[in-house]
């Protein structure tokens, strides 16, 4: 593969990371025909198709998966070398690829703001997705650091807790039902719940299983904001992270006093053991550990 270049790998990685040739061309400031030509050239060098169309979406072939892994290793090594050389010169640069579950989008920006001011030459790529999406990105080793409240159980992961995550029971502002009670006393009400698989839902389910509780009347809503607005409008009760309420009007919902609540777990920074951690990622992990 004598014709293989950093640029070809960079273009291919961008297509995978952004999900399409159009999005990659925009990210790389290249024309779509140029990106398509680079992809065709790389496919020719490999001698096999790198993508296939599945329901109108690009999906990597087995050969594409191998090339993507190679691209990550090669370009990651190049980036680390650049960072280390600049560090020796006293100049801090690099890229931090950060992927977080949806609820963590309320937690991470206040940490990123001072971090970016302290490290102005570090480029941050901030991805927000549901738990399944972030786990998929982690399995494909696409990012440096992942933020979960309920990380998957995997011996290949390093999980570092850095901040409490408190789940509270909320009700409409005009709620006049049971309060100062246990969760069982509220089970006659409709509960608005996150989807199965979300970190919030898993924490709630674990608690209910330990108490032998089942929600007889519930509605699944795949958005914290939508749940909060639905509670405000009187659709039902919910259990959400306190962080989702931080920037809402104080009278938009009522936080109930429920025995055993708030449920407390921790936000965790997760890295993959075999992935070499960039200097930028190391700096961010240090910033997380200094969060009060």
What residue ranges belong to the model's regions?
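A short LG(V/I)-centered, amphipathic sequence patch enriched
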Residues: 43-60
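Alpha-helical linker/hinge and terminal dimerization helices associated
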Residues: 43-46, 67-89
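Central regulatory/effector-binding core of bacterial HTH transcription factors
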Residues: 93-154
């Amino acid at each position: 593969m004598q014709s293989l270049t950093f640029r070809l790998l960079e273009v291919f990685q961008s297509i995978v990371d952004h999900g399409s040739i159009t999005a990659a061309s925009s990210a790389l400031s290249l024309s779509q025909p140029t990106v398509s030509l680079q992809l065709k050239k790389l496919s020719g060098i490999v001698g096999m198709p790198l993508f296939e169309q599945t329901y109108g979406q690009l999906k990597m072939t087995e050969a594409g998966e191998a090339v993507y892994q190679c691209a990550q290793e090669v370009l990651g090594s190049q980036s680390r070398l650049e960072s280390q050389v600049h560090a020796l010169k006293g100049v801090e640069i690099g890229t931090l690829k950060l992927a977080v579950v949806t609820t963590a989008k309320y937690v991470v920006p206040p940490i990123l703001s001072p971090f970016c001011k302290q490290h102005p030459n570090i480029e941050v790529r901030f991805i927000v997705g549901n738990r399944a999406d972030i786990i998929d990105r982690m399995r494909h080793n696409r990012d440096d650091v992942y933020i979960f409240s309920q990380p998957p159980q995997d011996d290949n992961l390093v999980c570092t807790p850095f901040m409490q995550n408190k789940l509270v029971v909320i009700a409409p502002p005009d709620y006049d039902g049971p309060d100062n009670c246990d969760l069982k006393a509220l089970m006659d009400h409709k509960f608005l719940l996150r989807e199965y698989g979300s970190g919030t839902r898993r924490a709630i389910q674990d608690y209910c299983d330990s108490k032998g509780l089942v929600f007889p009347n519930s509605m699944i809503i795949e958005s914290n904001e939508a749940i909060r607005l639905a509670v405000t409008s009187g659709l039902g009760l919910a259990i959400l992270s306190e962080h989702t309420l931080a920037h809402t009007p104080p009278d938009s919902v009522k936080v109930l006093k429920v025995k055993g609540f708030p449920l407390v777990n921790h936000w965790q920074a997760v890295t993959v053991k075999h992935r070499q951690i960039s200097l930028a990622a190391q700096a961010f992990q240090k910033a997380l550990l200094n969060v009060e």
